Amino acid sequence: MIKIKLYEHDVHRNECTFRPYVWAQNVLKDVGIELTDGDSYDYAWIAQASIINKKVSLGESVANGLEFLQNISGDYMILDGQDSTSLIGTYEVFKESNALLLLKNSLLKDRSLYKQGLQLGRYYWGEGDYKLEDFDQYSDRIVLSGTNWLATHWAGIKVQWFDYSRPKEYDVSAMFQYPSLTPSYEHGLIQSDYYDKFRKPSIDILNKMKYNIAKLDQGKRVSSEEYYKRLISSKIIFAPFGYGEMAPRDLEAAMFGSILIKPDMSYIDTSPNPFIDGETYIA
């Protein structure tokens, strides 16, 4: 039996990263893998919340992450379970550490793009182009984790399939936050302006259509019960990107027998990957 220690698995963002594996631990045991929090193990897994801090400078975050890893004995791997293809913060720690692998939920299918300068949805450490010019030196040890944000959301939840033949009141569901009622900040940076800017064109297009559209009234939230009532009653579920490319709505559309429309996912490399344009969603 191979034992894998989950370091600081109760820390919020670490818990999200480890959650799919914890829920599958009985299956993992069947193939000879045991998860543990004890001191006897073959490999240690270190998730991103233990080695990055978005509230300080990138340099300070990397230094703190490397200091944390100095206390790890034996072989270890780094897991970056964030819902973005960006490697900023974890990559810098990984390449200066003794980690065997960097496991990532999703990566750019064209790995050469990491060397060209992209922000990839993360600007906690500045808004300039983020280039990994030495990426090729480490790319063979940067691999997919076998999980992604869909697995995190649905870990331990039994999928319920609804009656597809039931009448649907709405043509399109646009039940996403817009506009923001109050400014939203994360790590001292405003997020709501970013969201509103790219969601406004979507709402503008929908408002011009002569269809019955389920949406929020001036961004005012509704109860969970009302939210799912409208979602289930929609023929089409429109799902713009959020912090990353995947969201619970992606699977809920299939559960509710609705057509999923979202931005193109063909540039994403992830596993499992249910996104097949023209079959499981429409780009």
Task: Briefly describe each language-model feature range.
Residues 2-34, 39-248, 255, 259-277:
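Nucleotide-sugar donor-binding catalytic core of glycosyltransferases
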Residues 281-283:
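Conserved acidic donor-binding segment of nucleotide-sugar-dependent glycosyltransferases
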